[in-house]
Design a protein with these regions (language model features):
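Residue-level recognition of short, solvent-exposed, well-ordered loop/turn junctions
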Residues: 71-74, 164-170
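...with weaker cross-activation on analogous glycine-rich loops/strands in unrelated enzymes
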Residues: 2-5, 38-124, 131
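Active-site nucleophilic cysteine motif
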Residues: 19-36
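Active-site nucleophile-His-acid catalytic modules used for acyl/amide transfer and hydrolysis
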Residues: 4-22, 39-40
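Short, solvent-exposed loop/turn positions at domain surfaces
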Residues: 66-67, 160-166
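SH3-family beta-barrel domains
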Residues: 133-157, 168-170
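Solvent-exposed, polar/charged alpha-helical surfaces in well-ordered, non-transmembrane soluble domains
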Residues: 5, 9, 13, 26-30, ...
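Solvent-exposed, acidic/flexible segments
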Residues: 1-4, 20-25, 85, 168
Length: 171
């Protein structure tokens, strides 16, 4: 299984590659073939077939989950264009920044752009080879107060001497 961060790093390394060299589906294939945890022999059909790959009749069965719409996008998911039209025409990799890395014919190659419905993105999927980052970009915030006691360390949310401990570590 490829970690989302690794997949995104690999895709970002391909930004600027011409569309003639690497179209959108081949960008996804290249990421899966070259990342640690990937499969050097991985293949899939076109973008429309990838979108349909969650069905039992699908040849490749690459998606483990999909939805119409882009709400709830997480780093490592695939974004799609054309969902609901019968012709899913484009795909890219969702990043931790809420952007999508994709190979755009109109822009001439691999780019990173906003992931918005206005831009045409209207579907999400989870690929069986790429682990979605559940807490992408999550950074603990706030202050914790450490109290040294004879029985070990105790962590509080507030500096007062009363109240519940968040965590206690014995010596």
């Amino acid at each position: 299984m490829i970690q989302a961060e690794e997949a995104i790093r690999a895709a970002r390394g391909l930004i600027g590659t011409s569309y003639e060299t690497l179209d959108c589906i081949n960008l996804i294939k290249k990421v899966i073939r070259t990342c640690v945890g990937g499969d050097k022999r991985y293949t899939t059909a076109g973008t429309n077939a990838l979108w349909d790959s969650d069905s039992k009749r699908g040849k490749y069965r690459d998606l483990t989950w999909k939805q119409a719409g882009i709400s709830g996008a997480k780093a490592g998911m695939l974004a799609f264009m054309g969902v609901g039209t019968g012709d899913v025409s484009h795909t890219g990799l969702v990043t931790e920044r809420g952007t999508v890395i994709h190979s755009s014919k109109s822009r001439g190659g691999v780019v990173e752009t906003e992931l918005t419905a206005k831009a045409g993105w209207n579907g999400l999927g989870v690929h069986r080879m790429i682990e979605v980052a559940e807490n992408a970009g999550a950074v603990p915030t706030g202050t914790a107060y450490i109290v040294c006691a004879q029985t070990g360390l105790r962590m509080r949310k507030r500096p007062d001497v009363r109240g519940e401990y968040m965590q206690m570590l014995s010596d």
